[in-house]
From Swiss-Prot:
GO terms for cellular component: ribonucleoprotein complex; ribosome. One of its GO terms (molecular function) is structural constituent of ribosome. Pfam families: Ribosomal_L31 (PF01197). Part of the 50S ribosomal subunit. This is Large ribosomal subunit protein bL31B. Keywords: Ribonucleoprotein, Ribosomal protein. The lineage of its organism: Bacteria, Pseudomonadati, Pseudomonadota, Gammaproteobacteria, Vibrionales. Belongs to the bacterial ribosomal protein bL31 family. Type B subfamily. Transmembrane segments: none annotated.
Length: 86
C-alpha cells in the first residue's frame, strides 16, 4: 500500500441513541468527540439513530403493512376502468 494516502483505521464508539446502546467497531470515521470506554481507554465517539440493536429487521419487531386493504381499495377505485363494455 502506498504510504500517506489511506485513512487511519481505529476503534470508534458508536452510540445508538434510539435504544441507548453503545458498541465499539473498527472504522475510518473522523470525529472530534471522544468518550471513555469500559476498558478505561478513550475512543472517538459518534452518535447514530439506527443500528442492529434498534432496526426492525434485526429486532424482529417489524411493522406489518396491511396489503389486503390497500389492494382492495385500489380495486374498488379503478374497477370501472377494467371492465370492457361492447
Amino acid at each position: 500500500m502506498k504510504p500517506g494516502i489511506h485513512p487511519e483505521y481505529r476503534k470508534v464508539v458508536f452510540h445508538d441513541t434510539s435504544v441507548d446502546h453503545y458498541f465499539v467497531v473498527g472504522s475510518t470515521l473522523q470525529t472530534d468527540r471522544t468518550i471513555e470506554w469500559e476498558d478505561g481507554q478513550t475512543y472517538p465517539y459518534f452518535t447514530i439513530e439506527v443500528s442492529s440493536e434498534s432496526h426492525p429487521f434485526y429486532t424482529g419487531k417489524q411493522r406489518v403493512v396491511q396489503k389486503e386493504g390497500r389492494v382492495a381499495n385500489f380495486n374498488r377505485r379503478f374497477a370501472q376502468f377494467g371492465s370492457k363494455e361492447g
